[in-house]
């Protein structure tokens, strides 16, 4: 018995030491040139070869060869629009969202790889400002989020793969807090997983809203990231309907990542403060090759977690706004036409 106890104690000391001697290898971003000066906050990686980006001056580009070449597939007449979200199903079907008050908020959809676009939605309410959108699995139903109108966040929905959109009644939406709004920073302020949808807020309050019925009714939950005029939750990512992570902070204090993340293991019913980041982060996503690994990006660099958001490590200092992970890699996009793929 004495030898057994000694052996157990030795193992308890050796195993952690071995784990520390071989920590997970940090990845790195490999830039891929796009030939564009626009800032790409809209991003959707379909797979390791196909990705779409939306730019700050009405440009949409697509690659089908892993970023070696890019096609300009911008909708006609889109110059001057600010695209902040791209949601693509494949190399042919994609929707892009432009932001702004009134008719500046638009959604275009293509079914032929960008050769032709349908003007699927034009916001006709000057009080509305659409920030982000997402589609449920399969791509038939999608939701788009506007900042509050008449004291409540507004949701538009599509049931025909993005071809047309309609504003949903607000009777199932909780009241917004004064000054509360969403951040159109990376197209991930509204996300879906399974039959569930969530969106995140900041400004007057830092909260998440959760729907289980296609966006008709929502419940609001306080988030652990502090709220302020330029602070709150900027990005959400859910691996499944239970496990989610949030990142954000204050974009006027880009090097401050204290209390800038959180995680949930119960579908957003409760959130726990995550580990500190190395700065404000505008985008986050789950890495496909590890169930507890996520990457977060922002203007001062990137961080990675190997424990589901409990702790984070910096691994790159390049500026990126959005991140989208696909099997085998992740895509990132940002200022001055920046696009990169994650390598190990």
Which sequence ranges carry the predicted segments?
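Bacterial N-terminal signal peptides
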Residues: 6-16
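Bacterial N-terminal signal peptides that target proteins for export
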Residues: 1-5
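Residue-level hotspots at or immediately adjacent to binding/recognition sites across diverse folds
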Residues: 22-344
């Amino acid at each position: 018995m004495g030898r057994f106890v000694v052996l157990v104690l030795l193992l308890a000391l050796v195993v952690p030491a071995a784990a520390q001697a071989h920590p997970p290898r940090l990845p790195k971003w490999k830039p891929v040139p796009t030939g564009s000066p626009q800032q790409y906050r809209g991003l959707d990686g379909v797979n390791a070869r196909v990705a779409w980006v939306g730019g700050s001056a009405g440009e949409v580009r697509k690659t089908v060869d892993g970023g070696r070449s890019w096609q300009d597939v911008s909708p006609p007449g889109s110059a001057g629009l600010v695209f902040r979200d791209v949601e693509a199903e494949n190399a042919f079907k994609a929707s892009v969202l432009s932001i702004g008050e009134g008719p500046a908020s638009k959604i275009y959809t293509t079914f032929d790889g960008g050769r032709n676009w349908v003007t699927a939605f034009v916001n006709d309410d000057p009080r509305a400002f659409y920030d982000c959108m997402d589609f449920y699995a399969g791509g038939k139903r999608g939701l788009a989020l506007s900042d509050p109108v008449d004291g409540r966040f507004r949701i538009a929905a599509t049931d025909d793969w993005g071809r047309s959109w309609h504003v949903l009644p607000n009777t199932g939406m909780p009241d917004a807090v004064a000054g509360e709004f969403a951040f159109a920073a990376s197209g991930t302020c509204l996300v879906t997983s399974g039959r569930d949808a969530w969106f995140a807020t900041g400004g007057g309050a830092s909260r998440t809203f959760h729907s289980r019925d296609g966006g008709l009714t929502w419940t609001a939950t306080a988030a652990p990231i502090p709220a302020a005029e330029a602070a709150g939750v900027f990005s959400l990512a859910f691996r499944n309907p239970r496990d989610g992570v949030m990142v954000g902070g204050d974009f006027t204090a880009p090097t401050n990542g204290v209390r800038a993340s959180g995680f949930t293991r119960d579908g957003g019913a409760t959130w726990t403060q995550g580990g500190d980041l190395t700065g404000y982060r505008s985008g986050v996503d789950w890495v496909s090759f590890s169930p507890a690994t996520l990457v977060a990006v922002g203007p001062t660099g990137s961080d990675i977690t190997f424990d589901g958001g409990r702790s984070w490590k910096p691994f790159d200092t390049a500026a990126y706004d959005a991140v989208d992970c696909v099997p085998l890699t992740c895509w990132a996009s940002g200022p001055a036409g920046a696009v990169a793929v994650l390598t190990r």
